[in-house]
Regions:
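Small-molecule pocket liners
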Residues: 1, 20, 90
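A solvent-exposed, acidic/Ser-Thr-rich amphipathic alpha-helical stretch
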Residues: 9-59
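Short alpha-helical linear motifs
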Residues: 36-41, 93, 109-112
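A short, glycine/Asx- and small/polar-enriched loop/turn
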Residues: 61-67
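Low-complexity, intrinsically disordered terminal/linker segments enriched in charged
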Residues: 101-120
Length: 120
């Protein structure tokens, strides 16, 4: 999470196993698609910050280990010049040292508006 604001996606291949299921707001993506999504953020936003409020890993009764991250994403649209801070929830299910299931949840409205400006 420290590398994302620096536009460094090198950690993604180390975090996820080859069969990982990654879900971003209801859309299943590959590790490569997630990396491209992160790179796109840096093309259309500046001053990106990812401030973690809580990072908790728990082992549940069924034996599964999950890490939950609650954070705030913030940035300024390069075209709109608007800024926003968006609450984010990330959930990672671990199989040993690799993630095999992940969910990224946030309100995409601000990001989608900036994407639309850049598609014109």
């Amino acid at each position: 999470m420290d590398l994302y604001p620096k536009n460094d996606q090198s950690q993604l291949k180390n975090i996820f196993n080859e069969a990982a299921s990654i879900n971003v707001n209801g859309i299943n993506v590959s590790v490569e698609e997630l990396a491209n999504f992160e790179k796109m953020h840096h093309k259309i936003f500046k001053g990106i910050k990812f401030q973690v409020g809580a990072n908790i890993t728990s082992k549940y009764e069924n034996g599964q280990i999950w890490t939950h991250v609650w954070a705030w994403w913030s940035g300024e649209g390069k075209k709109s010049k608007e800024t926003a801070t968006i609450p984010v929830h990330l959930a990672f299910n671990w199989d040993g040292l690799k993630c095999n299931n992940a969910f990224f949840m946030f309100d995409p409205t601000f990001i989608n508006k900036e994407v639309a400006l850049n598609d014109k």
